[in-house]
Protein backbone atom coordinates (compact mmCIF):
# COMPACT_ATOMS: atom_id res chain seq x y z
CA UNK A 1 0.00 0.00 0.00
CA UNK A 2 1.54 3.27 -1.21
CA UNK A 3 0.91 6.06 1.30
CA UNK A 4 1.42 9.76 0.62
CA UNK A 5 0.82 12.83 2.74
CA UNK A 6 0.54 16.14 0.96
CA UNK A 7 1.20 19.70 2.05
CA UNK A 8 4.54 19.56 3.86
CA UNK A 9 5.78 23.12 4.25
CA UNK A 10 8.89 23.17 6.42
CA UNK A 11 12.13 21.34 7.10
CA UNK A 12 11.22 20.72 10.74
CA UNK A 13 8.42 18.37 9.69
CA UNK A 14 10.63 16.82 7.01
CA UNK A 15 13.23 16.09 9.67
CA UNK A 16 10.59 14.60 11.97
CA UNK A 17 9.26 12.35 9.20
CA UNK A 18 12.76 11.27 8.19
CA UNK A 19 13.46 10.28 11.79
CA UNK A 20 10.51 7.92 12.05
CA UNK A 21 10.93 4.14 11.94
CA UNK A 22 10.53 2.98 8.34
CA UNK A 23 7.24 1.22 9.14
CA UNK A 24 5.70 4.50 10.31
CA UNK A 25 6.87 6.69 7.45
CA UNK A 26 4.79 7.62 4.43
CA UNK A 27 6.23 6.51 1.11
CA UNK A 28 5.96 10.02 -0.26
CA UNK A 29 5.14 13.60 0.64
CA UNK A 30 3.66 16.22 -1.64
CA UNK A 31 5.29 19.57 -2.34
CA UNK A 32 2.50 21.90 -3.40
CA UNK A 33 3.56 24.53 -5.95
CA UNK A 34 0.06 25.92 -6.59
CA UNK A 35 0.10 29.57 -5.54
CA UNK A 36 -3.63 29.47 -4.82
CA UNK A 37 -3.17 26.93 -2.02
CA UNK A 38 -2.37 27.71 1.61
CA UNK A 39 -0.01 24.73 1.46
CA UNK A 40 2.12 26.25 -1.30
CA UNK A 41 5.90 26.13 -0.82
CA UNK A 42 8.57 28.26 -2.45
CA UNK A 43 11.57 26.85 -4.26
CA UNK A 44 14.08 27.49 -1.48
CA UNK A 45 11.93 25.72 1.12
CA UNK A 46 11.30 22.86 -1.29
CA UNK A 47 15.05 22.46 -1.86
CA UNK A 48 15.63 22.17 1.89
CA UNK A 49 12.82 19.65 2.32
CA UNK A 50 14.06 17.49 -0.56
CA UNK A 51 17.58 17.51 0.90
CA UNK A 52 16.30 16.33 4.30
CA UNK A 53 14.07 13.62 2.83
CA UNK A 54 16.90 12.38 0.65
CA UNK A 55 18.79 11.43 3.80
CA UNK A 56 15.87 9.50 5.30
CA UNK A 57 17.09 6.24 3.79
CA UNK A 58 20.67 6.50 4.99
CA UNK A 59 22.09 3.90 7.34
CA UNK A 60 21.56 4.52 11.03
CA UNK A 61 23.19 3.00 14.07
CA UNK A 62 22.03 -0.45 12.97
CA UNK A 63 24.00 -0.08 9.75
CA UNK A 64 20.92 -0.89 7.69
CA UNK A 65 19.70 1.49 5.03
CA UNK A 66 16.02 1.99 4.23
CA UNK A 67 13.94 3.49 1.47
CA UNK A 68 13.96 7.28 1.39
CA UNK A 69 10.73 9.25 1.55
CA UNK A 70 10.02 10.56 -1.93
CA UNK A 71 9.09 14.17 -2.68
CA UNK A 72 6.29 14.53 -5.24
CA UNK A 73 5.79 17.86 -7.01
CA UNK A 74 2.15 19.00 -7.23
CA UNK A 75 1.15 21.48 -9.94
CA UNK A 76 -2.13 23.06 -11.03
CA UNK A 77 -2.29 24.38 -14.60
CA UNK A 78 1.26 25.69 -14.34
CA UNK A 79 3.15 26.81 -17.45
CA UNK A 80 5.00 23.86 -18.92
CA UNK A 81 8.41 25.48 -18.64
CA UNK A 82 7.82 26.16 -14.94
CA UNK A 83 7.01 22.52 -14.23
CA UNK A 84 10.03 21.32 -16.21
CA UNK A 85 12.25 23.80 -14.38
CA UNK A 86 11.03 22.69 -10.93
CA UNK A 87 11.43 19.04 -11.85
CA UNK A 88 15.01 19.55 -12.95
CA UNK A 89 16.01 21.89 -10.13
CA UNK A 90 14.71 19.53 -7.45
CA UNK A 91 15.38 16.26 -9.30
CA UNK A 92 11.78 15.21 -8.70
CA UNK A 93 11.03 11.65 -9.75
CA UNK A 94 7.25 12.08 -9.66
CA UNK A 95 4.95 14.91 -10.75
CA UNK A 96 1.29 15.21 -9.79
CA UNK A 97 -1.00 17.18 -12.11
CA UNK A 98 -4.02 18.51 -10.27
CA UNK A 99 -5.58 21.00 -12.68
CA UNK A 100 -7.19 20.91 -16.11
CA UNK A 101 -4.04 20.00 -18.01
CA UNK A 102 -4.85 18.69 -21.49
CA UNK A 103 -3.61 15.35 -22.84
CA UNK A 104 -1.42 17.31 -25.26
CA UNK A 105 0.15 19.25 -22.38
CA UNK A 106 0.85 16.03 -20.49
CA UNK A 107 2.42 14.41 -23.55
CA UNK A 108 4.75 17.38 -24.01
CA UNK A 109 5.64 17.33 -20.31
CA UNK A 110 6.43 13.64 -20.39
CA UNK A 111 8.71 14.15 -23.36
CA UNK A 112 10.48 17.10 -21.72
CA UNK A 113 11.01 15.24 -18.43
CA UNK A 114 11.92 11.84 -19.81
CA UNK A 115 11.56 9.06 -17.27
CA UNK A 116 9.57 11.06 -14.73
CA UNK A 117 6.58 9.34 -13.14
CA UNK A 118 3.24 11.07 -13.64
CA UNK A 119 0.19 11.06 -11.39
CA UNK A 120 -3.07 12.47 -12.78
CA UNK A 121 -5.55 13.83 -10.25
CA UNK A 122 -9.15 13.34 -11.33
CA UNK A 123 -12.09 14.87 -9.54
CA UNK A 124 -15.19 12.71 -9.24
CA UNK A 125 -18.68 13.49 -7.99
CA UNK A 126 -21.97 11.63 -7.82
CA UNK A 127 -22.36 11.92 -11.60
CA UNK A 128 -19.53 9.46 -12.01
CA UNK A 129 -16.26 9.25 -13.84
CA UNK A 130 -17.82 10.85 -16.91
CA UNK A 131 -15.30 12.42 -19.23
CA UNK A 132 -12.27 10.92 -17.53
CA UNK A 133 -12.52 7.72 -19.55
CA UNK A 134 -12.15 9.59 -22.83
CA UNK A 135 -9.43 11.80 -21.32
CA UNK A 136 -7.34 8.78 -20.35
CA UNK A 137 -7.96 7.18 -23.74
CA UNK A 138 -6.69 10.30 -25.50
CA UNK A 139 -3.61 10.30 -23.27
CA UNK A 140 -2.95 6.69 -24.23
CA UNK A 141 -3.22 7.58 -27.91
CA UNK A 142 -0.56 10.25 -27.38
CA UNK A 143 1.75 7.76 -25.68
CA UNK A 144 1.24 9.13 -22.17
CA UNK A 145 1.68 6.62 -19.37
CA UNK A 146 0.37 7.61 -15.95
CA UNK A 147 1.71 5.77 -12.92
CA UNK A 148 -1.51 6.42 -11.03
CA UNK A 149 -4.80 8.29 -11.02
CA UNK A 150 -5.30 10.16 -7.77
CA UNK A 151 -9.07 10.30 -7.31
CA UNK A 152 -10.37 13.26 -5.31
CA UNK A 153 -13.82 14.74 -4.73
CA UNK A 154 -15.32 17.09 -7.29
CA UNK A 155 -16.06 20.42 -5.62
CA UNK A 156 -17.08 23.30 -7.87
CA UNK A 157 -14.30 25.84 -8.29
CA UNK A 158 -11.76 23.80 -6.32
CA UNK A 159 -8.82 21.70 -7.49
CA UNK A 160 -8.61 19.50 -4.39
CA UNK A 161 -7.63 19.62 -0.75
CA UNK A 162 -11.22 20.34 0.30
CA UNK A 163 -11.61 17.52 2.82
CA UNK A 164 -14.56 16.14 0.86
CA UNK A 165 -14.63 12.49 -0.21
CA UNK A 166 -15.38 11.12 -3.67
CA UNK A 167 -18.17 8.50 -3.84
CA UNK A 168 -16.40 5.36 -2.65
CA UNK A 169 -19.10 2.91 -3.75
CA UNK A 170 -19.09 4.35 -7.26
CA UNK A 171 -15.32 4.04 -7.51
CA UNK A 172 -15.48 0.47 -6.29
CA UNK A 173 -17.92 -0.46 -9.04
CA UNK A 174 -16.99 1.82 -11.96
CA UNK A 175 -13.23 2.41 -11.86
CA UNK A 176 -11.74 0.32 -14.67
CA UNK A 177 -8.64 -0.83 -12.89
CA UNK A 178 -7.81 -3.41 -15.55
CA UNK A 179 -7.48 -0.66 -18.18
CA UNK A 180 -6.78 2.58 -16.34
CA UNK A 181 -3.75 3.48 -14.17
CA UNK A 182 -3.67 2.29 -10.54
CA UNK A 183 -6.26 4.05 -8.39
CA UNK A 184 -4.82 6.25 -5.65
CA UNK A 185 -7.60 7.33 -3.31
CA UNK A 186 -7.68 10.86 -1.88
CA UNK A 187 -10.27 13.27 -0.53
CA UNK A 188 -11.40 13.40 3.08
CA UNK A 189 -9.15 10.60 4.30
CA UNK A 190 -8.20 10.62 7.98
CA UNK A 191 -6.64 8.14 10.39
CA UNK A 192 -10.13 7.11 11.56
CA UNK A 193 -11.62 6.37 8.13
CA UNK A 194 -8.74 5.33 5.89
CA UNK A 195 -9.15 1.68 6.84
CA UNK A 196 -12.83 1.68 5.88
CA UNK A 197 -12.02 3.45 2.61
CA UNK A 198 -9.40 0.88 1.69
CA UNK A 199 -11.78 -1.95 2.53
CA UNK A 200 -14.49 -0.49 0.30
CA UNK A 201 -12.48 0.78 -2.67
CA UNK A 202 -9.32 -1.42 -2.65
CA UNK A 203 -7.02 1.30 -4.02
CA UNK A 204 -3.36 0.85 -4.84
CA UNK A 205 -2.53 3.79 -2.61
CA UNK A 206 -3.94 6.57 -0.45
CA UNK A 207 -3.20 10.26 -0.08
CA UNK A 208 -4.16 12.82 2.54
CA UNK A 209 -3.47 16.44 3.47
CA UNK A 210 -6.06 17.99 5.77
CA UNK A 211 -6.70 14.61 7.38
CA UNK A 212 -3.35 14.78 9.16
CA UNK A 213 -3.40 18.47 10.09
CA UNK A 214 -4.16 20.01 13.47
CA UNK A 215 -6.64 22.79 14.21
CA UNK A 216 -4.09 25.38 13.13
CA UNK A 217 -3.74 23.75 9.71
CA UNK A 218 -0.26 22.42 10.43
CA UNK A 219 0.80 18.86 9.67
CA UNK A 220 0.58 16.74 12.83
CA UNK A 221 3.27 14.07 13.18
CA UNK A 222 1.21 11.80 15.42
CA UNK A 223 -1.69 11.92 12.96
CA UNK A 224 0.65 11.06 10.09
CA UNK A 225 1.96 8.02 11.94
CA UNK A 226 -1.55 6.83 12.79
CA UNK A 227 -2.68 7.34 9.21
CA UNK A 228 0.24 5.32 7.85
CA UNK A 229 -0.26 2.51 10.36
CA UNK A 230 -4.00 2.27 9.77
CA UNK A 231 -3.62 2.34 6.00
CA UNK A 232 -1.04 -0.42 5.91
CA UNK A 233 -2.94 -2.52 8.43
CA UNK A 234 -6.11 -2.26 6.34
CA UNK A 235 -4.22 -3.10 3.16
CA UNK A 236 -2.82 -6.21 4.80
CA UNK A 237 -6.28 -7.31 5.93
CA UNK A 238 -7.77 -6.75 2.47
CA UNK A 239 -5.13 -9.10 1.03
CA UNK A 240 -5.92 -11.70 3.66
CA UNK A 241 -2.59 -11.29 5.46
CA UNK A 242 -2.29 -12.28 9.10
CA UNK A 243 0.27 -11.58 11.76
CA UNK A 244 2.90 -14.19 12.52
Predicted regions and their residues:
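N-terminal basic/disordered segments at the start of proteins
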Residues: 2-21
Amino acid sequence: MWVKVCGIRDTAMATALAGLPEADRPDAVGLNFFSGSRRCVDLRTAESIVAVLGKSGESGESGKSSKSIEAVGLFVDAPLDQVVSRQRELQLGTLQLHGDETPEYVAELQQACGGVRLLRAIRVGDSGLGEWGSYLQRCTELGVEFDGCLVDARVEGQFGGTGESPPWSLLASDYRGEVWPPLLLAGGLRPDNVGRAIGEVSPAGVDTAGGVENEDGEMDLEAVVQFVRNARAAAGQSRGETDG
